[in-house]
Amino acid sequence: MTKEKIVLAYSGGLDTSVAIQWLVESGYEVIACCLDVGEGKNLDFIKEKAITVGASESYTIDAKEEFAEDFALIALQAHAYYEGKYPLISALSRPLIAKKLVEVARQEGASAIAHGCTGKGNDQVRFEVAIHALAPDLKVISPVRDWKWSREEEINYAKEHNIPVPIDLDNPFSIDQNLWGRSNECGVLENPWTTPPEAAYDLTVSLEDAPDTADIVEITFDAGIPISLNGENMSLANLILTLNEIAGKHGVGRIDHIENRLVGIKSREVYECPAAVTLIKAHKELEDLTFVREVAHFKPIIEQKISETIYNGLWFSPLTEALVAFLKSTQKFVNGTIRVKLFKGHAIVEGRKSPNSLYDENLATYTSSDTFDQDAAVGFIKLWGLPTKVSAEVNSKVTITTEV
């Protein structure tokens, strides 16, 4: 009898390695699928490990460029910070992983997809909603959520089935990383009063250890897309990874955040996102230079909403599609170069230029070259203040009598 095929989102870690064996024992033929979205995974090692622990097939996909161009770029152009602080690191990669899982499932004729999320986090929602949006007919299984084992029980199961237990299993932190940044939780970080230890960080240095000399970078954008760093053209993925190194060594992009999770609890998260913070700041400055006032004032409303829909696992929803369409329509004239100083945890914009700049120095100056017609201000003020003046005149005639 042919076994039912299931595609597992495989990381190479303990949870998903145990999940392979558990699914095999449950009667499935397991096909492992692992993506590299910029965290520097050893895909060859992970591919072999999946087969070793029981998968019949193992897919490894280098998805860095697709992640950068189709997902991180949207977050950049949306200046996406969930609750004003979190630049959607993990939330951005989940829809791409779900998309690839569905593609492999279709290719292999699988009837189900499995993931390694617990029942306590946001990722279970993101994966399952995305999978159902792309393939409503596929079943979704969550072994880790279903078996409800303790960590000790999971380790014992692994040892009984000769599943390699990672040497860093005693790492107190739960870490997720992609090219847009690194997230860290658990361990001592669960106490919101505790100062995060330096061991919690990897992409950034402390302010005390940051250089005493700044780095100056120039980032050039074409239609809102970063295309070069310091005059060197490079792919978006490489630009982000390069900027992570440069900004990270200056301690840029450390975020300590109490976060309202989708599942209803608060969590304490520590993030590192040096490139994301730097690029968002630079992009915002270029928009300030090239946007008309009305678009500049309205776009933050869209930014807040798209941050929420992405965080809440609704990437493949009609609302997100509509929000992204608006976003892209605003980027046509976001062209130019931004100069940023990176120093002691700060990304400071020091210069900006654009062929589409709406800044007119002759209108802004207070020198003799001023071309602004100040006489026009009199009529403008009369019309602009007319509703306020009429309201004051009407209401000043109303006598309010208060009985004591």
Curated annotation (Swiss-Prot):
Catalysed conversion reaction: L-citrulline + L-aspartate + ATP = 2-(N(omega)-L-arginino)succinate + AMP + diphosphate + H(+)
One Pfam family from the record: Arginosuc_synth
Key word Transmembrane present: no
PROSITE patterns per the UniProt record, alphabetical: ARGININOSUCCIN_SYN_1, ARGININOSUCCIN_SYN_2
Binding positions (L-aspartate): 118, 122-123
Biological pathway: Amino-acid biosynthesis; L-arginine biosynthesis; L-arginine from L-ornithine and carbamoyl phosphate: step 2/3
Keyword tags: Amino-acid biosynthesis, Arginine biosynthesis, ATP-binding, Cytoplasm, Ligase, Nucleotide-binding
GO molecular function: argininosuccinate synthase activity; ATP binding
Main localization category: cytoplasm
GO-annotated cellular components: cytoplasm
Binding residue positions for L-citrulline: 86, 122, 126, 174, 183, 259, 271
Homology family: Belongs to the argininosuccinate synthase family. Type 1 subfamily.
Subunit structure: Homotetramer.
SS bonds (residue pairs): none
Binding site for ATP: 9-17, 116
Enzyme Commission number(s): 6.3.4.5
Name of the protein in question: Argininosuccinate synthase
GO biological process entries: argininosuccinate metabolic process; L-arginine biosynthetic process; urea cycle
Domain of life where this protein originates: Bacteria
The keyword Isomerase is annotated on this UniProt entry: no
Intracellular or extracellular location(s): Cytoplasm
SUPFAM superfamilies: Adenine nucleotide alpha hydrolases-like (SSF52402), Argininosuccinate synthetase, C-terminal domain (SSF69864)
